[in-house]
Structure formats: C-alpha cells, structure tokens
C-alpha cells in the first residue's frame, strides 16, 4: 500500500466483542485513533467505546471499511458478510484476527483459514496476526517484566507485513514474522479440532 510521507494510515476494527475490544484497548493505550464497527448501529456500543478511550471512534460498517488498515475481529463464519461491504479491497490491508473454531479442514478446502479469508477480500492484502492471543491476554499492556509481548504475523505480501510489523511495534508488541500464509498461517491457526503449534502461546521477548 503506497501512501505519501505526510499521510498517516487510518485504522478500523470490525467486530467489537472480546477480541475487538481488546484490540481497541491496545490502540487507546498508545493514543492511536481507530474506528470500531459492527453490523449494529454504532449508538448501541458507543458507551463501551467511550469507556475504553477518546481515540476509539464508534461508526458504521460502511464508514469503517474506508480505513487503510482493517482488523477483522469477527467470528470466522462472519467474514464473508464483512467482505461484501466493498466490491474491491484494493489498496487495503486486512489483518485477520479470526480463528476457525469448529470449521472442518474439508470446509476450508484443505487450505489455511487465513487463505480462505484472503480470497474473500478481493484485491486486499491480508496479514494474519494477533489471533494467537486470547482476549484476556491481548487486552493487557504488552510491556511485561521489562520485555514485550510477542505478536506473530504471517502474510504473502512483504509490504503489508512490514506495515503491520511497524504498527505492532507502535502498539508496544514485539512482532515476529512467520513467513507466508501457507507456512506461518498454519502455525497460528485454530481450525476444526486441530491447533497450530503457536496458537494461544503467550510469549515475551526481551531485547
């Protein structure tokens, strides 16, 4: 995604359940503005957003998808509904925070769940990330005992991965790139009754 040096990327979180709110707290902690949206009227969760911080902006789904970087924090089964919000996701980065709980490998066509999501968001650049942390951990300050909580990232697009790597750093995490979706994506995915080797691992890196 090419942006001028003076243009700051805009961010949105789609989904405002436990994971969406945990992500919002990470943004609020650093004073970074982020839009939050669900399929509901934003008034219905405005008070919850305000309680997290002044940089958390409740909005409609139609407005939220105008952002440059979109965190997908909905149930895996709901990702096609979000994908239909735009005819093309060209120029946007989608951060896939979903986990395909209970979805059989057969239903995924034998593919990593992140690749299935990537195919739904036509034209977009997908980065798998932050999904390996449960909400109760993700919402905590990533500064831990003098170290930083690890955020695993996987993507087939090096530019998108680099941008989310920088964002993760700004949010206080220690990002670790795991490679492409077929390799790294498998390490951090939960699908059906199987679990990737790194899923739900809460690791801290000391520089």
What are these regions (language model features)?
Residues 2-47, 51:
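NAD(P)+-binding Rossmann beta1-loop-alpha1 motif at the extreme N-terminus of oxidoreductases
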Residues 58, 125-131, 176-180:
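General beta-strand structural signal in soluble alpha/beta enzymes
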Residues 8, 66, 91, 123-126:
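A glycine-biased structural micro-motif
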Residues 22, 148-207:
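Active-site-lining helix/loop region of Rossmann-like oxidoreductase modules
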Residues 53-55, 59-93, 97-102:
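Rossmann-like NAD(P)-binding element
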Residues 35, 105-108, 174:
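Structural/interface elements that position substrates and couple domains in central-metabolism enzymes
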Residues 98-144:
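Rossmann-fold NAD(P)-binding glycine/threonine-rich loop
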């Amino acid at each position: 995604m090419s942006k001028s040096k003076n243009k700051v990327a805009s961010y949105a979180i789609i989904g405002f359940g436990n994971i969406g709110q945990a992500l919002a707290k990470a943004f609020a902690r650093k004073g970074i503005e982020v839009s939050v949206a669900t399929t509901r009227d934003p008034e219905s969760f405005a008070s919850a957003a305000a309680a997290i911080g002044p940089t958390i902006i409740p909005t409609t789904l139609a407005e939220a998808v105008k952002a440059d970087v979109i965190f997908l924090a909905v149930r895996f089964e709901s990702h096609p509904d979000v994908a239909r919000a735009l005819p093309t996701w060209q120029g946007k980065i989608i951060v896939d925070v979903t986990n395909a709980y209970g979805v059989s490998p057969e239903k995924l066509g034998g593919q990593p769940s992140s690749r299935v999501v990537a195919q739904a968001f036509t034209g977009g650049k997908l980065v798998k990330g932050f999904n390996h942390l449960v909400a109760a951990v993700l919402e905590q300050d990533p500064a831990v005992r003098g170290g930083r909580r690890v955020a695993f990232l996987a993507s087939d697009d090096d530019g998108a991965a680099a941008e989310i790597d920088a964002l993760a750093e700004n949010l206080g995490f220690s990002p670790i790139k795991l490679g492409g979706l077929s390799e790294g994506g498998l390490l951090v995915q939960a699908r059906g009754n199987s679990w990737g080797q790194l899923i739900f691992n809460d690791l801290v890196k000391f520089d």
